[in-house]
């Protein structure tokens, strides 16, 4: 898989075609697995890691799932290429920043990725556009079963799947949904919502998962622990709360249009104007402005722009993507200039509507 070619494509989860995709960017399920005969990654020697990587590479290739996957040696990539995969949500920051032998296997639609030698020996991830936890679960279950036919997982009859982190012991599952919640941020209700989520043992993280900051009003909601609950119970725990959050966000958007229509229209128009004319712009400012424009498109305030385009720009304007698209490494100053140029070119012809009706 050539990453330069991948930069010009859009993963399925970014297409904005799934259920409730106006607010739910993506649904993801991740399974943590370890190989019975090897020590955990945190206790593994450099040789152990190399042996784990080779073992899993060979076994995955022979599994029923292997033919649909492209194998990438993450340890052999440069910093830009590793960050590129992080920006596409195909690997974690932890895998990108780790040392020693490590890899990822990815399917052509970017729905499935298998990370090798992250916190656990193997982390299987499936991701779909919109709110589709059931579909993601069916897909990842099939991949897990296929790999499990050729890989002896570390499993305890009482405790379940054994993992490096105690919070993952049991099912080893992490269920997460990425939501775009700009209206709750603008109306200052977001902290109240997050406090309620923490009370029911759900975690709130930023765009790139654990330890990352929220950018562009995007948040990941996920379960915190797995022990003592079945996969179905954890899927339901997250699945039950997401429709409530969707309703809160939609009501907040309706309130903004009803009570502060001109102000919202002004915010959206200013954001769109800056994106179309800026000569230099940071990744952080771009994310925030794209967030406002994304909301504006869905409120009918901007024409000739669709959600799939905005979703794509959220990724393609990130530092590594800009460098892959340009074909050269760029320092911060040049990236900001290139980002502005790319946005001007992309939005050429799109016009904000002149009224708030």
Task: Describe the residue ranges of each PLM region.
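Long, Pro/Ser/Thr-rich low-complexity/intrinsically disordered regulatory tracts in eukaryotic proteins
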Residues: 1-158, 173, 187, 192-194, ...
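Conserved phosphate/anionic-ligand binding catalytic regions in large, soluble enzymes, centered on
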Residues: 160-177
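Alpha-helical support elements that line or immediately flank enzyme active sites
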Residues: 177-183
């Amino acid at each position: 898989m050539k990453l330069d070619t991948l930069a010009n494509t859009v993963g399925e989860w970014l297409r904005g075609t799934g259920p409730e995709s106006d607010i739910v960017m993506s649904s993801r399920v991740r399974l943590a697995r370890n190989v019975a005969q090897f020590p955990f990654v945190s206790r593994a020697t450099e040789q152990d890691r190399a042996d784990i990587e080779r073992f899993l590479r060979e076994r995955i290739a022979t599994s029923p799932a292997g033919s649909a996957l492209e194998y990438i040696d993450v340890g052999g990539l440069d910093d830009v290429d590793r960050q590129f995969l992080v920006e596409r949500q195909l690997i974690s920051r932890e895998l990108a920043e780790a040392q020693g032998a490590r890899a990822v296997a990815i399917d052509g639609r970017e729905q499935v990725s298998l990370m090798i030698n992250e916190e656990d020996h193997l982390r299987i991830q499936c991701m779909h556009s919109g709110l589709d936890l059931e579909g993601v679960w069916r897909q990842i279950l099939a991949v897990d079963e296929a790999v499990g036919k050729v890989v002896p997982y570390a499993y305890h009859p009482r405790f379940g799947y054994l993992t490096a982190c105690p919070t993952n012991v049991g099912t080893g599952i992490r269920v997460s949904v990425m939501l775009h919640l700009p209206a709750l941020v603008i109306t200052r209700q977001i902290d109240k919502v997050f406090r309620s989520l923490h009370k029911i043992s759900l975690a709130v993280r930023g765009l790139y998962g654990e330890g990352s900051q929220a950018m562009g009003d995007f948040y990941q909601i996920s379960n915190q622990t797995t022990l003592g609950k079945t996969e179905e119970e954890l899927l339901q725990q997250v699945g039950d709360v997401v429709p409530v959050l969707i309703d809160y966000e939609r009501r907040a958007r309706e309130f903004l249009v009803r009570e502060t229509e001109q102000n919202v229209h002004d915010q959206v128009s200013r954001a769109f104007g800056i994106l179309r004319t800026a000569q230099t712009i940071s990744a952080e400012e771009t994310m925030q402005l794209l967030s406002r424009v994304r909301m504006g498109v869905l409120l009918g305030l901007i024409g000739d722009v669709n959600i799939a385009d905005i979703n794509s720009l959220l990724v393609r304007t990130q530092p590594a993507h800009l460098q892959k698209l340009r074909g050269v490494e760029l320092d911060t100053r040049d990236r900001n200039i290139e980002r502005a140029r790319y946005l001007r070119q992309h939005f050429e012809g799109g016009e904000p509507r002149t009224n708030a009706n």
